[in-house]
Structure formats: structure tokens, C-alpha cells
């Protein structure tokens, strides 16, 4: 974890320590509002504080970098009925208390999920693998506790493909950014949001199809 991020999380947790209750917590900072509630009365308050702190660290940065029109108010709900990791819809993020209790250091689940809010692709039927790949790309760039969670982009393997989504796609995107054309990810994100993304988008942005890019990546995947 980056030292300044850790200090910020600890300070924010201390400041807000007495503000959390079993009901609904509404927190405001620098123009952003986070509303936190849930149905698990036994959920670890320390984990909840970290989730909240991470939101106020990463969300404003992501909004500024990717979509300045993104929501200023977000809802977190800790839901015992949800058995995945986390899910986002319409500015509301649902977290699994079972998962977070078992993986208390994986607080950058927040970073991934709030990027989905920032993406705001709406009803666009774009490729889901790219949506998730961009979200993990942003987690890799802006996550505050990836090391603590032992979360990292996987090394390339011949069994992988660009459309495997999540971290595999994210690593490919890092390679495109660093080895092919800087700014590609932001343009892909913007075109997904504007509903102008097509299969030919890769050629327009980089001069190569996504399949050609993947072939080059597979031959020299160092990032």
C-alpha cells in the first residue's frame, strides 16, 4: 500500500470512527456524497471504514481522469443476500459481507466498482470483456491496497486471449498503453460511453486490429 494512501485511510477512519451507526451513514467530502447502509449488523466496522476511505481517495481521481460528468452521490450497501464479491448498478454498489470478511485487505474492490459508475456505459451493448478489463486497468493504476490484497496483473500465458476480461484484459491494455499508443484506454472508455465503439475502433486508434495487437503482445508481452 502506498504510504500516503495508508495515512489518509487511517486519518479518515479516526475522524469518522464515531459517525458510523447500524443505520444509514451519509458522508460528504469535497463535493462527493457517500451513503452507506446494509443488513449485516455484525459486519466489521473497521472494514467498512476502509471501504469508505478508499472511496474518497480514488473516486474523485477517477472521475477527474475519465468522466467529469460522473455521479457526485454514490450508495454502498452491505448485503447478506449477495453471494458474489461486489456489483454495481445505477450508482449503487452492493458488497458481500462474507467475501469482505474473508478478504479484508481487498478494499480495492471499491476502486473496480466505482470505475463502473464512472464508465456509465448505459444500455450500450458493448463488449463486457472490455468493460471489465478497463475497470481492472484502473484498479491497477489507482488502487491503494493492491499489494496488501496480493492483487496483481497475471503474467502472460499462451492459453489467454484478449477477451478473457478482468486482469488478463487489463494487462493487455497496459501493454497497448505503454508499447503501442498512450491514451488508447481513455479513448476506448469514452467511445464505449458515447456508444460509438465498434470492432474497427482498435484499427482507428492504433492502426491494428485487436487480434493483430494481441498477436504482437503474445510475442513480446513485457510491460
Language model regions located:
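Bacterial Sec-dependent N-terminal signal peptides
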Residues: 1-23
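Juxtacatalytic substrate-recognition/specificity segment
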Residues: 22-114, 198
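Pan-zinc metallopeptidase signature
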Residues: 24, 176-223
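Soluble non-cytosolic domains of exported or imported proteins
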Residues: 45-56, 100-109, 125, 129, ...
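Solvent-exposed, polar/charged alpha-helical surfaces in well-ordered, non-transmembrane soluble domains
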Residues: 53-56, 60, 108, 136, ...
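Post-HExxH zinc-binding segment in Zn-dependent metallohydrolases
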Residues: 58, 126-169
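Surface-exposed patches in mature extracellular/periplasmic domains of secreted proteins
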Residues: 63-79, 122-128, 147-154, 173, ...
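Active-site recognition of the HExxH zinc-binding catalytic motif
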Residues: 108-120, 132-136
Amino acid at each position: 500500500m502506498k504510504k500516503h494512501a495508508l495515512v489518509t485511510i487511517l486519518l479518515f477512519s479516526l475522524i469518522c470512527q464515531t459517525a458510523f451507526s447500524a443505520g444509514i451513514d451519509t458522508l460528504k467530502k469535497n463535493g462527493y456524497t457517500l451513503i452507506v447502509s446494509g443488513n449485516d449488523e455484525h459486519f466489521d466496522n473497521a472494514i467498512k471504514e476502509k471501504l469508505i476511505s478508499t472511496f474518497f481517495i480514488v473516486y474523485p481521481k477517477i472521475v477527474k481522469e475519465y468522466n467529469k460528468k460522473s455521479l457526485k452521490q454514490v450508495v454502498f450497501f452491505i448485503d447478506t443476500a449477495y453471494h458474489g464479491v461486489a456489483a454495481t448498478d445505477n450508482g449503487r454498489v452492493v458488497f458481500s459481507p462474507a467475501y469482505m470478511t474473508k478478504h479484508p485487505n481487498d478494499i480495492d474492490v471499491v476502486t473496480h466498482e466505482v470505475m463502473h459508475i464512472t464508465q456509465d456505459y448505459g444500455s450500450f451493448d458493448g463488449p463486457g470483456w472490455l468493460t471489465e478489463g478497463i475497470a481492472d486497468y484502473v484498479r491497477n493504476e489507482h488502487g491503494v491496497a493492491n499489494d496488501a490484497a496480493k492483487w496483481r496483473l497475471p503474467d502472460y500465458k499462451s492459453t489467454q486471449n484478449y477477451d478473457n476480461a478482468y486482469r488478463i484484459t487489463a494487462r493487455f491494455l497496459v501493454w497497448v498503453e505503454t508499447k503501442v499508443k498512450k491514451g488508447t484506454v481513455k479513448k476506448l472508455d469514452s467511445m464505449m460511453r458515447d456508444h460509438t465503439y465498434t470492432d474497427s475502433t482498435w484499427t482507428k486508434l492504433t492502426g491494428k486490429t485487436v487480434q493483430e495487437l494481441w498477436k504482437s503482445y503474445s510475442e513480446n508481452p513485457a510491460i
